[in-house]
Amino acid sequence: MIQKIIFDLCFLCCSRVAFAQNEHEMSTTYQVPKDSLVRQKLVQWQDQKFGLFMHWGTYSQWGVAESWTICPDDWVTRTGPYSDDYFTYKKAYENLQTTFNPANFNPEKWVRAAKAAGMNYVVFTTKHHDGFSMFDTKQTDYKITDPKTPFSKNPRSNVTKEIFNAFRKDNFMIGAYFSKPDWHNQNYWWSYFPPKDHNVNYDPAHYPERWQKFKDFTYNQIEELMSGYGKVDILWLDGGWVRPSPEKGNDPQHYNQDLDMAKIAKMSRSYQPGLIMVDRTVTGEFENYTTPEQEVPDKPLSYPWETCMTIGKYWSYVPNDEFKPSIQLVQTLIKIVSRGGNLLLNIAPGPDGDWNPVAYQRLQDIADWMKINSKGIYGSEPVAPYSAGNIYFTKSKNQKAVYAFWLSEKAGVNLPASVSFAVNNIKQLKKVSLLGSTQKLKWQYQNGLLSIQIPDALQKSTSLKYSGTFELEY
């Protein structure tokens, strides 16, 4: 059994970016849900602003990209032992089940760090494309609770249930990530044919009984999650190439991979009324919000959206990952919220069951910033002009204040002698203050233009981090 296989991770990461441009492009049209409970929950979700994403599976033992190294797409590369023999490699990958034992698993520790940083919802990978279930499914033995998995002997082996329960106790909204494709399942990648790419490796139209078995398998797994894991707010479905297709042809890209999402949604909402469905990139009534990946739209969108982004370079645990600096994470959150979106920030647990210590430090830095500036994030909505130069705006939903985030180029904020910007649709301001400071500011507001004089002491102070946030009360 290979304990470690080294991959060309830089190439893999770049290739995934190129792949994402084709398969993970955000939808540009939107269908408002007919169900009033779904609309209500969407409003609640939009108020959360900041969520935690976690990609975790047996692949963390090798420190490689989640699932994709067993995919035969021509953009995938792998090096090291077995790299020249796909089927031997895939067998070794699947045997990672027999050594997976994340003994340091402690979801309450994650809850404390996430809550302090201002996160309010969590989305966890119950199953990624490789098909390994991180929950106690009855549909397959390729799962964390199977006796072949060492961690199955742990009383907390059903990690999906443990994660959901721990976060729910602290009032987080709960999201179940679920991969529609399943590269372990014989009814998706049938061993009669070699897999050619990430798609189903046979034409469902030619083998309808086999495809029906896969549809039933998918339905049953989702029903398990919806019926046996407490309150779930979001069903986050990945693998957008698995969708109905009006086109026909021999190219797998044109195969009709229809899972009957209407049936899945009806069943799911019978257990979870108001459930937010995120059939990402598919567009239509089952994509209740859109999910730009690793990018921030350059302007507000007219429908609910969420940027999903990694805290480092990779979605999965990779040793020596390059974590984004705290200033980038905070300022990305500001930009997203100013444009009406949510940030779903991914932190990947390692093979031992815990996060990299750097991830905890990043969340602590965000927590420290939130202690001063959260007023401009929560209970806010976008307001024109949204941004001007390095200043980004939000408005309180109670229509009593506008917040202007002056973004710093360095971690320590050095404000200039004066700051000026336009303020739209406010006839009169009552008060202008700097969050985190008790010093009074001199300011002038005429014809929609606000000019703020910054005292010398504040200009020289570096007590503020990442942004200087002005509160404009009216």
Regions found by a protein language model. Name each.
Residues Q21-Y474:
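Mature catalytic domains of secreted/periplasmic carbohydrate-active enzymes
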